[in-house]
Structure formats: C-alpha cells, structure tokens
C-alpha cells in the first residue's frame, strides 16, 4: 500500500491510496464464496451452484462490494499508520478499475487542527468576592414568607405590594388591538410583569373605580406591531387585596426542609445560598476563562465538526420546546452555526489544555460534586445511589470536573483581579446568562 497525502484548503486533506491487485482478487474470491453459500438458483441445491454461474450472476455486485470495503479498510489503515486526526467522514473517489491491476482511489477529508495554546497570560479574569450577609438571609426568608402569603380584600387604595383583579381594554389610535383585552385578570403588583407605567397607573385607585392609563410599549417588545406604540388602557378595578405574611413560627419553619426552629431554617438557607453562590462564581470564572481562550486562540475548526454540532443543537432545541424529533431537520442550520463553531473551538482548546498538562479527572472531586448536587434534594442518599447506578450521568459529572480542572490550570496563568459583589448582583447576573 503506497500513500500520498495532499494539503488542500484550510483543514481539508486528500490522500491517494493504492490496493494490490492480488489482495483485491483474494477478497473477491471470498466474497463469491459467501454468495455461493446462500444463492438460490433454479436447478441447483443451495450451496452447490457452480462458481461460473455464481460469477455470472453475482460477480459485478461482489466486485463492487470488495472495492467499497477495500477503500474503507485501506483508508482507515492509513489513518492509523499516519496518525491522521480525522474529523468527520471521508469522501471516496475511485479511479477507473482494470481487472487484474492494482486499484487506486482518493479520499478527501478534514482533520482537526494542531493547537498550540498561546496568550494565556493575556487572559483577564475578574474573580467575584462575595459574603452572604444577615440581610441576604433575611431577604430570602422574606421570599419564603411571600410564597406562603394569604390575601385579604381591602377597601384602601392599591399599593405597589398589593394584588388586584381588573378588567382592561387597550386602544392604539382609538382602536382596540389584538391581545389587549382581559376580564377578571389577576395582577400581582410590584413584579414588573406588565409594560412600564401599567402597574404605576393602578397605584392609588380603589376597588370599583374606572380609569384610563396612558403607556408606551417598549421598543424591544416581543410583538412587532406594538413596538414603541403609544396606547391607552381603560381599567376597571374590581378588587384590591393586601398581602398577609405568615409569622415566623415553628409551624411555618417545618414547611421548609428538615429545620425545626428559625435558627435551623436560617442555617439551612445559608447553606443553600452558599451552594448557589459557589456554582454561580464558578460558572462566571469559567465563562471568562473560555472567552479569553477563544479570543487568544481563534483557531480554525473542521466544517464537518461544526455540522455535527449543529445537529446536536437542533435536537436540543426541539427537545427544549417539546417538538417531535423529525422537526429538527426543518430548523435552519444558520440559526446554530455560530454557537456550533464556538462549541467546537472551546472543546478543542480545553482538550488541548487537558492533554498538554496531562490532567486526569479527580475522582474524589467527582464524588464531592455528586454529593453537592444531591444535597439540594430531600433524600440526598437516593440521588447519590441513582448516580452510582447510572454510568452516563456519572460520566457527565466527570466531564464537568475535568473541564473545571482545565479552567483552573488556565486560571493560574491568567491575570486575575478580585472585585467585591453582593449576593444579589452575582445571582442576577447568573440568571441573565
């Protein structure tokens, strides 16, 4: 087998391979034997058909199968011997085959790039420094109280903390518009669920009043026909309800986790907040490191690898929105191309960090990560046991831990500065992605 490799555009390569005629002929004879074992020819018993008839009937198909198999086998032998870092499937182009002669063909394919990391010392990372305060815990307890709140009807004017039941009709240029009308609509004030100015226009009014509110739809509003439009809403305020918060009693505390006292509840809340904070800070640092890696190493990636990643993103998008699997092919590849390219780049760069630093996954850290995940559930032992029985889930955690270890290696060489943040700031940024 002789090998000649050409470098084409970008990461494309072409290899010309030759298969010895004797090897083809030997494989051809074996293929005919397989046909002879199973061939059904009138006048002959199974397995007793003469070779000449087998060759006459099946010779062309057998030779085509042999040539196809030899192209596959010979190419992948070359991949191994030449240590080709193959990306995607090859395209085979056979040359004209002459019976009794050597068979040559070309295989066109892509390779993964040889990555040499650079500029790690130029990566800038801001490391958040956050302390969970008593006020943060108080605020979280207030959230829990609001979740258990009851409502009492009130004759007083509506405030920003009340709940109101309203009828409304929206008008633009004096005409009603689609989606701008509702009856007995329950609105929890102060949550910003309506467009700016809507809730503010209700504050100060009492049950039974009818009034108008003038508002303007935001320029970034989701409905194209309403963006930036001035509107008037005719409001009927049917009911105003005040929020009644429960007292911090043992009965209230027992509704949340295993705590029996307010002090135990506060400790449990702080533990959960610390876990959420750790995850948020880790994700924030990892994101900065990855952004820096890509900026400093804007590597070329194989088109085939991008195409494979696009298919993954398509399937994930369909699953996320509850669609049928066959809908994935209908989603335009352009929607996912940029994300797919970045994911391939990130994967290659992190793999290079792992390989060049000979990083091995820390199994103790894997188990600790699983324990941390389990601690968020009421029965952590059951969650840990579930991971122990599910190799795929455990492998996912291993991959996460391995990436974290790679990020930490890069972090050692990056420019790291610390900046103080509040708990709410970090969690708000985490929610925004």
Curated annotation (Swiss-Prot):
Family per similarity comment = Belongs to the FKBP-type PPIase family. Tig subfamily.
Instruction: Give start-end ranges for the coiled-coil region(s).
Output: none
Q: Which GO terms describe its molecular function?
A: peptidyl-prolyl cis-trans isomerase activity; protein folding chaperone; ribosome binding
Decide whether keyword Cell cycle is in the record.
yes
Quote the protein name from its UniProt record: Trigger factor
Enzyme Commission number, as recorded: 5.2.1.8
By which gene is this protein encoded?
A: tig
Q: Does the keyword Isomerase apply?
A: yes
- Source species: Haemophilus ducreyi (strain 35000HP / ATCC 700724)
Report the residue ranges that make up the PPIase FKBP-type domain in this protein: 161-246
Role according to the record: Involved in protein export. Acts as a chaperone by maintaining the newly synthesized protein in an open conformation. Functions as a peptidyl-prolyl cis-trans isomerase.
Q: Per UniProt, which keywords does this protein have?
A: Cell cycle, Cell division, Chaperone, Cytoplasm, Isomerase, Rotamase
Q: What class of enzyme is it?
A: isomerase
User: Entry's PANTHER family?
Assistant: TRIGGER FACTOR CHAPERONE AND PEPTIDYL-PROLYL CIS/TRANS ISOMERASE, TRIGGER FACTOR-LIKE PROTEIN TIG, CHLOROPLASTIC
Which GO biological process annotations does it have?
Answer: 'de novo' cotranslational protein folding; cell division; chaperone-mediated protein folding; protein transport; protein unfolding
Give the CC-aspect GO terms: cytoplasm
Query: So what does this thing catalyse?
Result: [protein]-peptidylproline (omega=180) = [protein]-peptidylproline (omega=0)
The protein's location, in the record's own words, is:
Cytoplasm
PROSITE patterns linked: FKBP_PPIASE
How does the entry describe the domains? Consists of 3 domains; the N-terminus binds the ribosome, the middle domain has PPIase activity, while the C-terminus has intrinsic chaperone activity on its own.
